[in-house]
Amino acid sequence: MTTLTAQQIACVYAWLAQLFSRELDDEQLTQIASAQMAEWFSLLKSEPPLTAAVNELENRIATLTVRDDARLELAADFCGLFLMTDKQAALPYASAYKQDEQEIKRLLVEAGMETSGNFNEPADHLAIYLELLSHLHFSLGEGTVPARRIDSLRQKTLTALWQWLPEFVARCRQYDSFGFYAALSQLLLVLVECDHQNR
């Protein structure tokens, strides 16, 4: 990635963490369809690798705005995809994809972070990885910790996430019939891939 700043990438990761951590409320639903978000999406589309994924997400959002009981339907999609058994779902946990659930805990310790007591999910939840990546990108922009140390931890986190993210995204595509979370996960996949290549 060349045109997005470390802070902008951090914001994208934080935003995605929020959307994958809990069902959207009315305020979030209004926000994702707002003019402000359209500007943000326009900025993201200035990065060629992200363009197609952002376009698809915008299409899903446009369809969402005319969906009857959009929030309730999206909540049902969230529940079906992320909270049910793994037979027809895309569980957002590293351990669901035969990955070491302790790896994220080690990465958090290395970053001087810990999970919040307010987040009632296991530490290997996708949102924790994304929050860590957001934190690391913000730290890169601040310059208070040596960039080499932050970048090393960022690469370790991206590598750990990449071990299971493609399968998670494939399952989102397979089981999300409406497609909002499938599009969101595709944007995440492309972002992580670009971030990983930007060594």
UniProtKB/Swiss-Prot annotation:
- Please give the Gene Ontology molecular function terms for this protein: identical protein binding; molybdopterin cofactor binding; peptide binding
- What SUPFAM superfamilies does the record point to? TorD-like
Top-level taxon? Bacteria
Provide this UniProt record's keywords sorted from A to Z.
Chaperone, Cytoplasm
Subcellular location(s) of the protein: Cytoplasm
Q: Which Pfam families match?
A: Nitrate_red_del
- Lipid metabolism among keywords: no
GO annotations of cellular component type: cytoplasm
- Answer whether the UniProt record assigns the keyword Cytoplasm to this protein: yes
Q: Which family, according to UniProt?
A: Belongs to the TorD/DmsD family. TorD subfamily.
The identity of this protein, by name, is Chaperone protein TorD
Per the record, the gene is: torD
